[in-house]
Curated annotation (Swiss-Prot):
It comes from Buchnera aphidicola subsp. Schizaphis graminum (strain Sg). This is 2,3-bisphosphoglycerate-dependent phosphoglycerate mutase. InterPro entries: His_Pase_superF_clade-1 (IPR013078), His_PPase_superfam (IPR029033), PG/BPGM_mutase_AS (IPR001345), Phosphogly_mut1 (IPR005952). GO terms for biological process: gluconeogenesis; glycolytic process. The lineage of its organism: Bacteria, Pseudomonadati, Pseudomonadota, Gammaproteobacteria, Enterobacterales. The gene is gpmA. Keywords: Gluconeogenesis, Glycolysis, Isomerase. Substrate binds at residues 10-17, 23-24, 62, 89-92, 100, 116-117, 185-186.
Length: 230
């Protein structure tokens, strides 16, 4: 029986997660542990008899591959999958590719935590000629450079995630379709904050673990009434 539930999953551990680097829009592979995490997430969903009508993911392979492993485990590899840059991880600007502990040593733990977790604070931004600018990547060639980030706060991340939710995912939910989203820590934080009306200061405390299914339940007005880890 179809229910008003949405499943969110952050990708499995990536090779840069393992090295404690700011990853952002860098297209990094899953680690061996990340692959195992994705398979376990799929097995858990299968055990709980989850079945989906649609899936959404980002343009980054750590999320795409996590979704692939999950759907393989569910024997749902045929499922329609929509990929969008709007579900990409938050762009960490000039921090991308750098080690988090080294940045803490340089700037202090409080400042780095604000860059990582706060709602409105933007990390140091890159320039358009920086190789880390998404406009230099062929996969974003059909997107206006003015829309692509030089570095984002959670607030800026939410400004691209929420329109995608309203245009593509919410209409599917309203038709009582069962939807799976596999994305990233901050794009999912932005969505969870929006759907559950979490205070901007409280969102600082939310850290989403890798490859752990999150269930959101909606009422008949399609408002989120609760969320929890499976």
């Amino acid at each position: 029986m179809k229910t008003n539930k949405l499943v969110l999953i952050r990708h499995g551990q990536s090779k840069w997660n393992k090295l404690n680097k700011f990853t952002g829009w860098h297209d990094i592979e899953l680690s061996d542990n990340g692959i195992n995490e994705a398979l376990k997430a799929g097995s858990l969903l299968k055990k709980e008899k989850f079945f989906f009508d649609y899936a959404h993911t980002s343009m980054l392979k750590r999320a795409i591959h996590t979704l692939r492993y999950i759907l393989d485990t569910l024997d749902q590899s045929w499922l329609p999958v929509q990929k969008s840059w709007r579900l990409n991880e938050r762009h960490y600007g000039a921090l991308e590719g750098l080690n988090k502990d080294e940045m803490i040593s340089k700037y202090g733990e409080e400042q780095v935590n604000l860059w990582r977790r706060s709602f409105e604070i933007i990390p140091p931004q890159i320039r358009l000629n920086d190789k880390r600018f998404p406009g230099n990547d062929i996969r974003y060639s059909n997107i206006d450079n003015n829309e692509l980030p030089l570095g984002e706060s959670l607030e800026l991340t939410a400004k691209r995630v929420i329109p995608y939710w309203n245009k593509f995912i919410l209409p599917q939910i309203k038709k009582r379709n069962r939807v799976l989203i596999v994305a990233h820590g901050n794009s999912l934080r932005a969505l969870i904050q929006f759907l559950n009306k979490i205070d901007n200061k409280k969102i600082l405390e939310l850290n989403i673990p890798t490859a752990t299914p999150i269930i959101l339940e909606f009422n008949e007005e399609y408002n989120s009434i609760k969320w929890y880890y499976l």
